[in-house]
């Protein structure tokens, strides 16, 4: 490969890297609350009583996930899709890093909680699981009225 070919190749590679970096920077901003955090259905006690314990464990863990990922952030948002910029928070490197670290810490905490729950939660009474699910669901329903307090 001659010098001209090497320079051309280097130029093309640098242009691609620059384009990729700009595309990453101009990409969609991460949400304060991720889009996968939602409850598709709320339940009545009678419906929960008809479920098997394994189904209740899954519901319980999903509600824990939503609570862990939403409640610490309700001063900013109660629904997925809200970004720092949409709240008027400057989109600085420091703020993006802080959000990423918070998201990672929340994910790690949830994974550790889930690991513990998988070991210990099967020993819980079905009636306690049902009561906890109903309590968590009522808590999550209250988020729909959060804006009423502003």
Q: Over which residues does each language-model region extend?
A:
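Generic structural concept
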Residues: 61-64, 68, 103, 133, ...
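A generic structural signal for ordered alpha-helices
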Residues: 34, 38, 45, 52, ...
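Immediate post-signal-peptide N-terminus of mature secreted/exported proteins
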Residues: 22-72, 76, 150
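Mid-chain, structured segments of secreted extracytoplasmic proteins
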Residues: 68-115
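Generic preference for flexible, low-structure residues
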Residues: 17, 76, 81-83, 122, ...
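C-terminal amphipathic alpha-helix
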Residues: 109-150
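Bacterial Sec-dependent N-terminal signal peptides
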Residues: 1-29
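Non-transmembrane, amphipathic alpha-helical segments
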Residues: 52-63, 91-94, 98, 121-124, ...
């Amino acid at each position: 490969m001659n010098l001209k070919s090497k320079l051309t190749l280097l130029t093309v590679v640098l242009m691609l890297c620059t384009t990729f970096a700009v595309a990453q920077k101009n990409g969609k901003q991460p949400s304060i609350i991720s889009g996968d955090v939602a409850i598709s259905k709320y339940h009545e006690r009678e419906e929960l009583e008809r479920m098997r314990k394994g189904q209740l464990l899954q519901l319980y863990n999903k509600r824990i996930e939503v609570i862990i990922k939403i409640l610490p952030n309700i001063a900013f948002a109660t629904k997925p899709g809200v970004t720092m910029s949409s709240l008027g928070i400057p989109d600085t490197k420091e703020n993006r890093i802080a959000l990423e670290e918070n998201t990672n810490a929340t994910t790690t905490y949830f994974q550790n909680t889930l690991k513990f729950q998988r070991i210990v939660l099967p020993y819980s009474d079905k009636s306690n699981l049902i009561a906890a699910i109903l309590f968590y669901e009522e808590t999550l329903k209250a988020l729909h009225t959060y804006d009423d307090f502003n």
